Amino acid sequence: AHGMLGYTVQVPRSGGRLLNALKWDERVDPENWQPIETLFQRAAAAGINVTHVAAKRYENSGFTRAVFRGAQYKGANLVADLISETKLALHKAPSFVYLYVNDLDTAGHSDGVGSEKWIAALSMIDQMVSQLMKEVPKGTRIWVTSDHGMINVQEKIVIGLDNPLMQGVSVVAGEPRARHLYLDSDSPTARAETASLWQEYLQDKALVLTREQAISSNLFGSEVSADALDRMGEVIAIA
């Protein structure tokens, strides 16, 4: 229902313009794009002091406004400051603090899981959590989680514009893990033929579905909003 379908998606009726969810686009209103009340807003309405602690550069980003609104933002770039802001926020009981650190994710995307950079980032986070456990108020529960898993990919598939797979495809969006293909024609025949062509080429490297197949498989939840349907690719290739 929230309509956040991938790293990049095509903005409906924009002439093929893509919205990068992390970099955003000032022409797109975050609260209109993602109108559903957030968990932070619901918690705040219930009387819980909600704080979002993360790097200063994320504070007014479109993604933050779309997904994390409802929390008081505390920007901090150094580990010591992240811990300090978290500790201060937890003294306002009842409280919930969402602390985001992107170092491990960045290292994994750039250098791979298990790389020296990744191990260093993991060690830093381990030390940070250990320090947090010593400094937060007694009785505080700490959950350590991640927004997604990560594996190292051995093969890179690059499809050029002159590739037969691109016939009838006007825009490619999404991300390497799941591509949204927007077609010149939104006919059932075009969707089925494109999905079949891509599946034959990719074989067991990906699962290629038409929009209808993805929806019927509940890949986007049991209820798909009109906005989500409007933004979804006619064909979706999932690694």
Regions found by a protein language model. Give the residues of each.
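Feature captures the catalytic ectodomains and active-site-proximal regions of enzymes
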Residues: 1-239
